[in-house]
């Protein structure tokens, strides 16, 4: 009997992507995050769909509809907590996935990397518009502050901001369109994920050594399906722990108050996963400069493949680059901390120094380290 999974037009695609896919024999747990992100996306879409059934995108009822979901809908509190904390898990996996790509030189698969950066931006946009929907104080003021940044664009800025708002300030029209965006974007993300995988399967996976693994490949199933399943269980364990025992620990207390345009919260700040970019934005006193730095902090990922100077792909055998990579990691944690602090000394100067170090590491120090390592590996007479 002919094996159906190898002949059926649809099953054949799944078979070549997840079952008989030749995978390097030495990929570590750092390669689990792709599948974990897939699981996160599915969880977010399913929980989001059930939330959308009960949510109303109107300024008068949005806040109370979220309260209604938590109080009156069967397991509504659980669905909402899973969705809110699922976003945090999503970004945690995203940052680790990108970090893995930088450490092991996966960015040299340029198409896959570029689609990945577009995916990151799309997920960030989705999370931003989603945070506005509960229409609490931080939702409203976060939306006001971030959309206001568009007005820094010369000539067309104010018009652009009012166009996004659908009026002269963040109001009913803004909330309605943000709900529409928040609903459609995850499906766009799903399409981009398929393109991301399509490009990845053109080249095959990278591996920790950075050496071409073609001479030693193993089938994806059962080796990596089992390994991924362990990752899913650990992810669900952490997510359920967060959602059941500490659902509000990553949120902002101000969001328990309904949005009030007449009362500004003392410290306006986004969710934790945007704090590093927010710190870079705030570290520049000029509004337009801050917006450009904010964009550059993410878009800099697009030029990382061009800054690769080392003869080796992976950082596995490059101690100088490794040191700089972990300094970059610590620097991003510092920026995340600074983003949540008030705008006063010493936080201002720490944020400015951390921002300078962030760009210096990626644009100058890491390429120089690659060149230095090449020089050190050259045979000397």
UniProtKB/Swiss-Prot annotation:
Pfam families: Cytochrom_B_C, Cytochrome_B. The keyword Metal-binding applies. The cytochrome bc1 complex contains 11 subunits: 3 respiratory subunits (MT-CYB, CYC1 and UQCRFS1), 2 core proteins (UQCRC1 and UQCRC2) and 6 low-molecular weight proteins (UQCRH/QCR6, UQCRB/QCR7, UQCRQ/QCR8, UQCR10/QCR9, UQCR11/QCR10 and a cleavage product of UQCRFS1). This cytochrome bc1 complex then forms a dimer. Belongs to the cytochrome b family. PANTHER family: CYTOCHROME B (PTHR19271:SF16). Gene3D superfamilies: Cytochrome Bc1 Complex, Chain C. Binds 2 heme b groups non-covalently. Keywords: Electron transport, Heme, Iron, Membrane, Metal-binding, Mitochondrion, Mitochondrion inner membrane, Respiratory chain, Transmembrane, Transmembrane helix, Transport, Ubiquinone. Heme b b566 binds at residues 97, 196. Its cofactor is heme b. The keyword Ribonucleoprotein does not apply. Component of the ubiquinol-cytochrome c reductase complex (complex III or cytochrome b-c1 complex) that is part of the mitochondrial respiratory chain. The b-c1 complex mediates electron transfer from ubiquinol to cytochrome c. Contributes to the generation of a proton gradient across the mitochondrial membrane that is then used for ATP synthesis. It comes from Sminthopsis murina. Heme 1 (or BL or b562) is low-potential and absorbs at about 562 nm, and heme 2 (or BH or b566) is high-potential and absorbs at about 566 nm. GO terms for molecular function: metal ion binding; ubiquinol-cytochrome-c reductase activity. Heme b b562 binds at residues 83, 182. It is found in: Mitochondrion inner membrane. It is a multi-pass membrane protein. This is Cytochrome b. PROSITE patterns: CYTB_CTER, CYTB_NTER. The chain crosses the membrane at residues 33-53, 77-98, 113-133, 178-198, 226-246, 288-308, 320-340, 347-367. Its main location: mitochondrion. One of its GO terms (biological process) is mitochondrial electron transport, ubiquinol to cytochrome c. GO terms for cellular component: mitochondrial inner membrane; respiratory chain complex III. Coiled coil: none annotated. A ubiquinone binds at residue 201.
């Amino acid at each position: 009997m002919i094996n159906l999974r190898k002949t059926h037009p649809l099953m054949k695609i799944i078979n070549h992507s997840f079952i008989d896919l030749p995978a390097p024999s030495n990929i570590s747990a750092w390669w689990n995050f792709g599948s974990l992100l897939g699981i996160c996306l599915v969880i977010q879409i399913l929980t989001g769909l059930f939330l959308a059934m009960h949510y109303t995108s109107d300024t008068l009822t949005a806040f109370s509809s979220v309260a209604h979901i938590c109080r009156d809908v069967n397991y509504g509190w659980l669905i909402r907590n899973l969705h809110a904390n699922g976003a945090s898990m999503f970004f945690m996996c995203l940052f680790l996935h990108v970090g893995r790509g930088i450490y092991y030189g996966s960015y040299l698969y340029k198409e896959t990397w570029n689609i990945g950066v577009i995916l990151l931006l799309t997920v960030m946009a989705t999370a931003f518009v989603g945070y506005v929907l509960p229409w609490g104080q931080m939702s409203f003021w976060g939306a006001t502050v971030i959309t206001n940044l568009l007005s820094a664009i010369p000539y067309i800025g104010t018009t652009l901001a009012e166009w996004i708002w659908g009026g002269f300030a963040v109001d009913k029209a803004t909330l309605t369109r943000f709900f529409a965006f928040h609903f459609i974007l995850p499906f766009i993300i799903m399409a981009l994920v398929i393109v991301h995988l399509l490009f990845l399967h053109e080249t095959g996976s990278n591996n920790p050594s950075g050496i071409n693994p073609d001479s030693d490949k193993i089938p994806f199933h059962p080796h990596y399906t089992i390994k991924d399943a362990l990752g899913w269980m650990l992810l669900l364990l952490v997510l359920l722990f967060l959602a059941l025992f500490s659902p509000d620990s990553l949120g902002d207390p101000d969001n328990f108050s309904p949005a009030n345009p007449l009362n500004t919260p003392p410290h306006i700040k986004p969710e934790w996963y945007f704090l590093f970019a927010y710190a870079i934005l705030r570290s520049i006193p000029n509004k337009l400069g801050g917006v450009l730095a904010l964009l550059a902090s993410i878009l800099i990922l697009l030029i990382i493949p061009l800054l690769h100077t080392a003869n080796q792909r992976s950082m596995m055998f490059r101690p100088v680059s490794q040191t700089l990579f972990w300094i970059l990691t610590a620097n991003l944690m510092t920026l995340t901390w600074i983003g949540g602090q008030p705008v006063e000394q010493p936080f201002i100067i720490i944020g400015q120094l951390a921002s300078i170090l962030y760009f210096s590491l990626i644009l100058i120090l890491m390429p120089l380290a690659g060149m230095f390592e090449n020089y050190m590996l050259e045979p000397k007479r």
